[in-house]
Amino acid sequence: MLRVAVLASGRGSNLAALLAASRAPDAGYRIVGVFSDQADAGALALAREADIEAAAVTRRPDEPRAAHDARLFARVAEVQPNLIVCAGYMRIISAEALSQLAIPMINLHPSLLPLHPGLDTHARALAAGDAQHGCSVHVVTADLDAGPLLAQSRIAIEADDTPERLAARVLACEHRLLPATVRAIARGTLDLSGPVPHHGGVPLSAPLQLD
């Protein structure tokens, strides 16, 4: 059984999707801890309602980013996860902290990477005239939103889309994509044990398309 720790900064809608999917008999994973940089994050309340370890590790005034990350990951290590999932975690993790992690960490991003890393992805997709938009799951590395891509889900951009409407449509994709990716890791279909992700025993050359 894959032990998953989740990092989240906000309301926790993707955490809720992960929790719901984890209850399936063949899920292959369970969430063992939820951690946030925000003391009032809705994700923490969701975790506590589900009797899952939950903790806020907030950044202290003038605390270096690497020091905050070290405290965070020391707390995460207490639940002994095999995988860390960033599901709406809004802080950039320091390269120093990442270099000391002994387990893989993945992130859900609301664009079809490598397009539109960073923030405001929905408005940027519309401004660019993109025909498609969606979400991606990738391995977290020191480069922002640039780690190896694992899976994507895409939708067509419609003529009447606004950033808000597009965000809502992509969020529905996120709620399917993230649990599907974690299930694939739990079942060994996606292997993150080496420097290059593998799928079905061969190096993953392109992200899985999980529409």
Region annotations inferred by a language model:
Residues 21, 29, 83, 87-200:
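Donor/substrate-binding cores of folate-linked one-carbon enzymes
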Residues 1-42, 46:
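N-terminal Rossmann-like dinucleotide-binding module
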Residues 16, 193-211:
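Short, basic/aromatic-enriched C-terminal tail that caps enzymatic domains
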Residues 55-60, 108:
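Short beta->alpha connector loops at strand-helix junctions that form conserved
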Residues 8, 65, 69, 167-171, ...:
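Amphipathic, non-transmembrane alpha-helical scaffold segments
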Residues 36-37, 60-61, 65, 69, ...:
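N-terminal glycine-rich "phosphate-gripper" loop used for MgATP/nucleotide binding
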